[in-house]
């Protein structure tokens, strides 16, 4: 009896435990069902780091492709890059990101997951979750727990992928080592080392030319030399290869700009080579990967050479050289600097020393010196930013240097070497009581006596976004009396203007095939194009696209096409090679400068790499003065250079006294021209219309004419069919004399209307057109005519040599000429270009099938990684899994990304599952959505199975094998327990 009771109690306990355990297994496995798909995917992980943002949020980009088979186990690859720490606890939550579909077909589906790591030290728990939304709409929670790692072995990451579940649930973890070391190493390579291919460069043509192809350069007039190269490269260029050439130390490529860059070499919109300036005048161009597999590569380079004011300080002849692969190009140039503005007893000169466009700052150097041993009394020197001043800027810095040896050794190039203490003495502190500096950028220096030469160094800023900067140096004073003579006061003004230029660079290439290692060959079919256009403040105006297979011609041309006129000022040039977007003065490049330019004009040249050909034509207008005015016993001498660069022709007012032409060429064009109202004298001059190769219909309106006609008035009609040479006739013309205009008033000369309709004409005559004449449309003419007024129309159909005729039909209506009012003393020409603009061509990458993957960012503080989260046991007696040890080499763990269907672009519906309720709700607003991109640098791991599932809208699923077996196992436990309990009851009854 006792044995039966003892066995019954044991069976009761065993049965109850079995029922409880089976129920827990069934419930737990039911909450965590996952459909195992039969698709094959390859898992690779690539990690890179970028700098953290200001708010300490770093982004880690992980490119993964998951391997899923119909087996029960799922494998994930990751590389641990985060160092766990027991002292620091970090919670990272992900914000939602957009999902993009893959762009090209790959053997495996590629995903890019961007996660923003936000560090919060207030929360004690260690937790790292990733919420993502895939195409099926379900959400998953990813837990990352680092495993053990020694210093001599790579750190590994355990990746757990599970659905939301209860706290007491514990799911077995499926892990495997990261086997993508090769892909990671390839992605970590940030710089490709190439070889020096200077020896493989052949100089076919080279030259150094002065301004306008002369041997003369005036640096203060904005002039510079140009280095021209035609280069040929041997085949087999690779990414990272470079070539160098060296310039002489008396020239540079930047002018007064603080930027030390050279423009990129482009083939259309593709960068073929990047340039940079090295020490000792060396320039290096490094090829990009777009030069791979290119053959017959040639380059045309035109680089500006600015005279260095530090090296060459005086007027004279200077030799400029450039060397490339043993080929030396040289030129003797005549250098001439300006002397500023002055009188017999004083002189003022200056220049803009540097110009920093990024910081909106510039420096200026001014010379103030007496001449001929005069002592000047009550002298006032002022510096003013007349254009481009920043009223809200900081106070400028002004330093004053006293020059020894009476200023005779001052460089003509207007250069200050403040470190030369023997030549320049800093007297700024002594002049503080006499110096006034204002916040708007102006300064004033008052001197009781000027008997020494001074150099004033100014450092200030200009208004951001301005298109012109002008700095004015002015001196006013009285010279001392000599020999009983009293000298008048004087005022000297010297303006330093700044003009910005832009470099251009374009080119095209020729594709070829190169056999490598005799094992395989590369044949590239990339797009070759040349895109040209015009840049100004309104961005792209016009583009032109040419597609061909010509050699790679790179054109760098930044020289001014032509400068004419009288330039008295100091015009400096800036060549700035900033690769960022240019926001100042794309329209201020000067093709032609005309007029009297007095003052110091500085030119800034921007050589940012663009593949559009700029139109650098402009109009320079301005008030120019170079005079001396004596008024009220005072003498004023002013030299100024006010340059305004205008894209559009200005309105003109006044009298038109010259021929006004309108020329239209080579197009079917309807031109409406007519004279409007003119104020002033009614002398039109000559109105000339030239139409080439066109069939012309002319409608003339002569209208009403009032006044007296004192001469013979005649109307002559010639309709003869046969005439000798130099006579008229040949056509029958119907004339309606009712339409002859009324003529009234006084005309001293013969008034005649002559019509020539002959068919045959001798040489040197024009004709060949049929013209309809309507005399009703004759315009009204009022006033006195003191000479013969002749209206002659020629309607010949046949002409001998030298005739002008055509095949295009053009209608001219004379009464639609634009209104011209005002006074014009020259010939006004209006040219109309009817070439239709070509829209810009979008940029096409040379290798669209291999886009560059995004670079993931490294956490800003790798010393505070996230330690693993211990799991909560379901029962008190259940042992807790051991916590992994801290790896010795910290790395950032990368969570696996949600799976993407094998066929991108088609949505995958979710598998039929029961609703799942997570035990811990995830914070709203902080989720991560995978961004699907293509990473060509990641080497995919070979799939475990060769056969992939066919593309379809609904992927094949392998059934719920692992979870069903668990539920079956739990159910058997429950049934066994119930059986034992029932048997126990029977024993009790017995």
From Swiss-Prot:
One Gene Ontology cellular component: extracellular region
InterPro entries: Adhesin_Fg-bd_dom_2, Adhesion_dom_sf, Fibrogen-bd_dom1, Fibron_repeat-bd, LPXTG_anchor, SDR_Ig, YSIRK_signal_dom
Motif (YSIRK-G/S signaling motif): 7-18
GO biological process: cell adhesion
Region (Fibrinogen/elastin/tropoelastin-binding): 194-511
Region of interest (Disordered), residue spans: 33-61, 96-193, 702-969
Residue segments, region 5 X tandem repeats, Pro-rich (WR): 851-920
Residue stretch(es) of the prosequence: 958-990
Keyword Chaperone: no
Membrane topology: Peptidoglycan-anchor
Top-level taxon of origin: Bacteria
Keywords in alphabetical order: Cell adhesion, Cell wall, Peptidoglycan-anchor, Repeat, Secreted, Signal, Virulence
D- repeat residues: 707-744, 745-782, 783-821, 822-850
WR repeats, residue ranges: 851-864, 865-878, 879-892, 893-906, 907-920
Residue spans of biased composition, Polar residues class: 37-55, 741-752
Protein name: Fibronectin-binding protein A
């Amino acid at each position: 009896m006792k044995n039966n009771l003892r066995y019954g109690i044991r069976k009761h306990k065993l049965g109850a435990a079995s029922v409880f355990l089976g129920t827990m297994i069934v419930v737990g496995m039911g909450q965590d069902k996952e459909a195992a798909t039969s698709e094959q995917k390859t898992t690779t992980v690539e990690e890179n780091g970028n700098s953290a943002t200001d708010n300490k949020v770093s982004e880690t980009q992980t490119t993964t492709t998951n391997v899923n088979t119909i087996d029960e186990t799922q494998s994930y690859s990751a590389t641990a890059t985060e160092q766990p720490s027991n002292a620091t606890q970090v919670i990272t939550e992900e914000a939602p990101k957009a999902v993009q579909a893959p762009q090209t077909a790959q053997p495996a589906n590629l995903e890019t997951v961007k996660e923003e790591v936000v560090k919060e030290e207030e929360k004690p728990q260690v937790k790292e979750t990733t919420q993502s939304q895939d195409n099926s709409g379900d959400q998953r929670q990813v837990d990352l727990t680092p495993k053990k790692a020694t210093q001599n072995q790579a750190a590994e990451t355990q990746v757990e992928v599970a659905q939301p579940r209860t706290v007491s649930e514990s799911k077995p973890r499926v892990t495997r080592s990261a086997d993508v070391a090769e892909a990671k190493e390839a992605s970590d390579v940030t710089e490709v080392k190439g070889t020096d291919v200077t020896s493989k460069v052949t100089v076919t043509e080279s030259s150094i030319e002065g301004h306008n192809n002369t041997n003369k350069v005036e640096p203060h007039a904005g002039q510079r030399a140009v280095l021209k190269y035609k280069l040929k490269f041997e085949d087999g260029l690779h990414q990272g290869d470079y070539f160098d050439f060296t310039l002489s130390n008396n020239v540079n490529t930047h002018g007064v700009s603080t930027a030390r860059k050279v423009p990129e070499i482009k083939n259309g919109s593709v960068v073929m080579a990047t340039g940079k300036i090295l020490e000792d005048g060396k320039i290096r161009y490094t090829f990009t990967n777009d030069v791979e597999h290119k053959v017959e590569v040639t380059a045309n380079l035109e680089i500006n050479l600015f005279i260095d004011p530090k090296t060459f300080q005086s007027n004279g002849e200077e030799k400029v050289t450039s060397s490339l692969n043993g080929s030396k190009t040289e030129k003797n140039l005549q250098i001439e600097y300006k002397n500023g503005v002055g009188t017999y007893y004083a002189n003022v000169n200056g220049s803009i020393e540097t110009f920093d466009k990024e910081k909106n700052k510039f420096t200026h150097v001014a010379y103030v010196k007496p001449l001929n041993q005069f002592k000047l009394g009550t002298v006032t020197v002022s510096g003013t930013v007349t254009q481009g001043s920043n009223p809200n800027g900081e106070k400028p810095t002004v330093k004053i240097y006293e020059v020894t040896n009476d200023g005779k050794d001052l460089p003509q190039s207007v250069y200050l070497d403040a470190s030369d203490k023997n030549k320049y003495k800093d007297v700024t502190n002594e002049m503080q009581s006499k110096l006034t500096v204002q916040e708007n950028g102006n300064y004033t220096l008052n001197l009781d006596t000027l008997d020494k030469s001074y150099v004033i160094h100014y450092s200030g800023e200009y208004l951001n976004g301005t298109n012109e900067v002008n700095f004015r140096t002015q001196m006013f004073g009285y010279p001392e009396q000599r020999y009983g003579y009293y000298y008048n006061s004087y005022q000297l003004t010297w303006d330093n203007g700044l003009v910005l230029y832009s470099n251009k660079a374009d080119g095209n290439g020729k594709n070829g095939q190169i056999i490598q290692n005799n094992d395989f060959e590369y044949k590239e079919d990339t797009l070759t194009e040349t895109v040209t256009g015009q840049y100004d403040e309104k961005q792209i105006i016009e583009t032109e696209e040419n597609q061909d297979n010509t050699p790679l011609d790179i054109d760098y041309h930044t020289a001014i096409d032509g400068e004419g006129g009288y330039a008295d000022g100091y015009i400096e040039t800036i060549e700035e090679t900033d690769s960022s977007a240019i926001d100042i003065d794309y329209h201020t490049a000067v093709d032609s400068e005309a007029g009297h330019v007095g003052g110091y004009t500085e030119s800034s040249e921007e050589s940012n790499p663009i593949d559009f050909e700029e139109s650098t034509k402009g109009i320079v207008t301005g008030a120019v003065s170079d005079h001396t005015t004596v008024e009220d016993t005072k003498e004023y001498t002013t030299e100024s250079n006010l340059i305004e660069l205008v894209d559009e022709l200005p309105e003109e007012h006044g009298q038109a006294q010259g021929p006004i032409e309108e020329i239209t060429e080579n197009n079917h064009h309807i031109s409406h021209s007519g004279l409007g109202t003119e104020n002033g004298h009614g002398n039109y001059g000559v109105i000339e219309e030239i139409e080439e190769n066109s069939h012309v219909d002319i409608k003339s309106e002569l209208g009403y004419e009032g006044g007296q006609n004192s001469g013979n008035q005649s109307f002559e009609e010639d309709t003869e069919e046969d005439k000798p040479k130099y006579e008229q006739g040949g056509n029958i013309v119907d004339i309606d004399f009712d339409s002859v205009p009324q003529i009234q008033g006084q005309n001293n000369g013969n008034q005649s209307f002559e019509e020539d309709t002959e068919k045959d004409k001798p040489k040197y005559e024009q004709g060949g057109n049929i013209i309809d004449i309507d005399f009703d449309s004759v315009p009204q003419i009022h006033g006195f005519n003191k000479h013969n007024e002749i209206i002659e129309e020629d309607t010949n159909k046949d002409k001998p040599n030298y005739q002008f005729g055509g095949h295009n039909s053009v209608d001219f209506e004379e009464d639609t000429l634009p209104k011209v009012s005002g006074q014009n003393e020259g010939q006004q020409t209006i040219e109309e270009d009817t070439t239709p603009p070509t829209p810009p061509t979008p940029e096409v990458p040379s290798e669209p099938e291999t886009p560059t993957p995004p670079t993931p960012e490294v956490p800003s503080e790798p010393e505070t990684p996230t330690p693993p989260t211990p799991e909560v046991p379901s029962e008190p007696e259940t042992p807790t899994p051991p916590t992994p040890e801290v790896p010795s080499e910290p790395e950032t763990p990368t969570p696996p990304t949600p799976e993407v269907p094998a066929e991108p672009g088609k949505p995958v519906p979710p598998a039929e599952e029961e609703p799942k309720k997570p035990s811990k709700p995830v914070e709203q607003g902080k989720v991560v959505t995978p961004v699907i991109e293509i990473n060509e640098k990641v080497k995919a791991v070979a799939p475990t199975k060769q056969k992939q599932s066919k593309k379809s809208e609904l992927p094949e699923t392998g059934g719920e094998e692992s979870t069903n077996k668990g539920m079956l196992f739990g159910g058997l436990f429950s049934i066994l327990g119930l059986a034992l309990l029932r048997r126990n009851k029977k024993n009790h009854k017995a």
